[in-house]
């Protein structure tokens, strides 16, 4: 389901203001303020996301209007009809899903967040003719975890109390009855949601709606981590904190086991399907996909525990026989779970059926056609660039639409490739630096082309066989007008050459009214994790980084550097960090800082570094080098020791503790000399309710530093009560950025040999 609150009626015929291949710098005199960038986020481009629907006319979609009503609109003609009036929408509606024939709406209400993607809710089915609402479960109490229509609309599968149910014409069948705290049916446990599936469901209907494949997770034996909540959303703290008992497997600990099940909806028969690609205790199922137009074949992408070996196992539904149809060895690094398998069918005159997937088996991530029956794959794209997303598959035209880095790793352009001729066609001018995306209609005849930067984003509507837009969908004219009042930091992009000959992508933000004759402090803002990317030519939000480059009392240059190990520059570039996280990443950030220090407009004595999550870890590893290149470090929600993080993420890059003990020891932040010597000190921030990167990381790091004699003038610590990894509880986010602003101001004003308090010069007796 996609929310949209913007009407498309009356949109411009085409984009009024041409965009430039660089970020805007404004044409006014106003400077961005803290309140505008951090508190209110006042200047933000908008975009619509539509839920395309299949009707007699291609280009129809459903959206929720500003008054709350559900409407169907033709993106081609702008004709609009009301599906559900505003006064018939259920109270406290959070989300909705439309019946395939538009006869009913499935509503989620009474929303309660769980983890990153998951939530609990009540669900109601609304008949569009009578507008009557029926509860999906009569006794529901905000406890349903997931619900989904079949592709044909004959039934709804839903998950409650970790059990799978099927609703058909007001009759409900319970499919599993063993769900509980340690057994999950149809929904992932915490680690599969966070690290593998990246979503809140683990069930998939066959294309014809006859079968349901779902995963069953068994957490028996998985160690428990306790997260305390001191306030627990109360105004006055309870005498005893609420404790969340979370099954959280850390490095080399027991992982949940996973099992594939098939349900035939007509008979209600459920069958477990063994996947023997790897030992059951080692098996990770990364993806489930139906490789058929009906219900003949379902496939799973299976990995070993450390995710450097992969097998695609196809299951014949009729016989339940399984066969490995594709296999990869990635022991030179790791294998990413890209969730990109999709059925194509026969190609050309051949009756052999194929599916498409993204694979970096050539050293670069590209599109490949794999035979469903097994055999040699066919490369659709190739070269020293990478495919990042499959957007649409047009079977009648035999085309795949995709995004790639063909022009540059910091850019995304839209292309199609024919699986008949292998001809690649750009749908945008790929010689102009930009980031694009697109959303295709249900029959593939139209698409919304989204320009995402570096200039102010906009969206145009195209017909698939036209090179000119039909009209503009979103112009963001209000943002363009607002920017006329401001003068903005100047964002530039370049590459730094390492001694090895490799290059690092850099995004530099120069302060407002920059003068090359002045010297400015610098803030490095890395993330730096495996496969990640921060340096992108997408629109850069007018956020905290824009603020510190605008405030006349701060005027910081910011550098964002994508170190070795980050994504979209080929397998060799990213896999160098395997089994030694923190080493090359820190070396690259130090190298970049040393290069920055040589610039005539950089104050080499005031170069700071701040990172969040993996960026917080990387900041710590940089400080640990004791290079002298950085004068201040800020670590927000950092990992400090990979033994403390979850197994499925960590072992993908570090292998097991038993096989790589030396690597784990080297990757932990334990050397204190850099913390003692960093001239402006270090600030460590962490939420006590972080269920992802546990507060344990900061607690252990601070104990190491204090125990080793790091002084109070060098170390400041700030915890955020009950905040999770995003640090937003009870105003924590604004406090965090105010504190960071204060530290950056103090660092800018810090004198190299300033006087200190007398008690800091001698031992305290």
From Swiss-Prot:
It is found in: Secreted. Keywords: Aminopeptidase, Glycoprotein, Hydrolase, Protease, Secreted, Serine protease, Signal, Virulence. GO terms for cellular component: extracellular region; plasma membrane. Glycans are attached at residues 35, 78, 101, 110, 169, 218, 465, 490, 665. Its EC number is 3.4.14.5. GO terms for molecular function: aminopeptidase activity; dipeptidyl-peptidase activity; peptidase activity; serine-type peptidase activity. Residues 1-14 form the signal peptide. It catalyses: Release of an N-terminal dipeptide, Xaa-Yaa-|-Zaa-, from a polypeptide, preferentially when Yaa is Pro, provided Zaa is neither Pro nor hydroxyproline. The active site is at 613 (charge relay system), 690 (charge relay system), 725 (charge relay system). It is an enzyme of class 3 (hydrolase). GO terms for biological process: proteolysis. It comes from the Eukaryota. Extracellular dipeptidyl-peptidase which removes N-terminal dipeptides sequentially from polypeptides having unsubstituted N-termini provided that the penultimate residue is proline. Contributes to pathogenicity. Belongs to the peptidase S9B family. PANTHER family: DIPEPTIDYL PEPTIDASE 4-RELATED (PTHR11731:SF162), PROTEASE FAMILY S9B,C DIPEPTIDYL-PEPTIDASE IV-RELATED (PTHR11731). This is Probable dipeptidyl peptidase 4. The gene is dpp4.
């Amino acid at each position: 389901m996609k929310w949209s609150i913007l009407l498309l009626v009356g949109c411009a015929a085409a984009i009024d203001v041409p965009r430039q291949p660089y970020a805007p710098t404004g044409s006014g005199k106003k400077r961005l303020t803290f309140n505008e960038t951090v508190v209110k986020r006042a200047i933000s481009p908008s975009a619509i996301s539509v839920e395309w629907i299949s009707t007699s006319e291609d280009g129809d979609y459903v959206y929720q209007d500003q008054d709350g009503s559900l409407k169907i609109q033709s993106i081609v003609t702008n004709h609009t009809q009301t599906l559900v009036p505003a006064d018939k929408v259920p109270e406290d509606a959070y989300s909705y899903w439309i019946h395939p024939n538009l006869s009913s709406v499935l509503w989620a209400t009474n929303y309660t967040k769980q983890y990153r993607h998951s939530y609990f809710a009540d669900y109601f089915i609304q008949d569009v003719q009578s507008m009557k609402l029926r509860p999906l479960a009569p006794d529901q109490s905000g406890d349903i975890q997931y619900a989904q229509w079949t592709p044909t609309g004959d039934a709804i599968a839903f998950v409650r109390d970790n059990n799978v149910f099927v609703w058909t014409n007001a009759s409900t069948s319970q499919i599993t009855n063993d769900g509980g705290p340690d057994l999950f049916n149809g929904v992932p446990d915490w680690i599969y949601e966070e690290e593998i599936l990246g979503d809140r469901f683990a069930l998939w209907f066959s294309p014809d709606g006859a079968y349901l494949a779902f995963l069953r997770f068994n957490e028996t034996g998985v160690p428990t981590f306790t997260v305390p909540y001191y306030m627990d959303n109360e105004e006055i703290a309870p005498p005893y904190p609420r404790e969340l008992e979370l099954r959280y497997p850390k490095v080399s600990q027991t992982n949940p086991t996973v099992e594939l099940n098939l349900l035939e909806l007509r008979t209600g028969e459920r069958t477990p399907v063994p996947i023997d690609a790897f030992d059951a205790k080692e098996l990770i199922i990364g993806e489930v996909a139906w490789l058929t137009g009906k219900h003949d074949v379902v496939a799973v992408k299976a990995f070993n525990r450390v995710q450097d070996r992969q097998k695609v196992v196809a299951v014949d539904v009729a016989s339940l026989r399984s066969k490995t149809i594709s296999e990869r060895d990635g022991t030179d690094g790791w294998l990413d779970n890209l969730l990109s398998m999709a059925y194509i069918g026969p190609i050309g005159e051949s009756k052999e059926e194929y599916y498409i997937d993204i694979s970096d088996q050539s050293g670069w991530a590209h599109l490949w056609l794999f035979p469903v029956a097994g055999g040699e794959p066919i490369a659709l794209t190739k070269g020293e660039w990478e495919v990042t997303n499959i957007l649409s598959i047009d079977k009648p035209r035999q085309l795949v639409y995709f995004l790639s880095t063909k022009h540059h790793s910091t850019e995304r352009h839209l292309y199609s490739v024919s699986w008949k001729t292998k001809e690649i066609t750009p749908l945008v001018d790929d010689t102009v630096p930009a980031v694009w995306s697109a959303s295709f209609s249900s029959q593939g005849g139209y698409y919304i082309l989204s320009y995402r930067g570096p200039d102010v984003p906009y969206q145009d509507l195209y017909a698939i066989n036209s090179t000119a837009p039909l009209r503009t969908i979103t112009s963001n004219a209000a943002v363009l007008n607002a920017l006329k009042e401001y003068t903005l930091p100047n964002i530039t992009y370049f590459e730094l050459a390492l001694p090895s000959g490799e290059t690092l992508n850099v995004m530099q933000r120069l302060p407002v009214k920059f003068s090359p004759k002045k010297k400015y402090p610098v803030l490095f803002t890395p993330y730096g994790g495996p496969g990640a990317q921060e340096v992108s030519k997408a629109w850069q939000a007018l956020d905290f980084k824009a603020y510190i480059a605008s405030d006349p009392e701060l005027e910081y240059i910011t550098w964002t550097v994508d170190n070795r190990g980050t994504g979209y520059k080929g397998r060799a570039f990213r896999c160098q960090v395997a089994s030694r996280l923190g080493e090359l990443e820190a070396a690259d950030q130090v190298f970049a800082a040393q290069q920055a220090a040589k610039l005539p407009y950089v104050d080499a004595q005031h170069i700071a570094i701040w990172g969040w999550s993996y960026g917080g870890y990387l900041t710590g590893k940089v400080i640990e080098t004791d290079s002298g290149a950085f004068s201040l470090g800020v670590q927000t929600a950092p990992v400090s020791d990979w033994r403390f993080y979850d197994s499925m993420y960590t072992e993908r890059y570090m292998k097991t503790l038993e096989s790589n003990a030396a690597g784990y020891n080297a990757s932990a932040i334990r050397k204190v000399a850099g913390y003692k010597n960093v001239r402006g000190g270090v600030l460590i921030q962490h939420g006590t309710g972080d269920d992802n990167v546990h507060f344990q990381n900061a607690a252990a790091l601070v104990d190491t530093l204090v125990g080793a004699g790091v002084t109070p003038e060098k170390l400041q610590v700030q915890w955020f009560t009950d905040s999770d990894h995003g640090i937003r509880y009870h105003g924590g986010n604004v406090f965090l950025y105010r504190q960071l602003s204060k530290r950056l101001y103090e660092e800018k004003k810090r004198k190299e040999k300033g006087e200190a308090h007398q008690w800091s010069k001698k031992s305290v007796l």
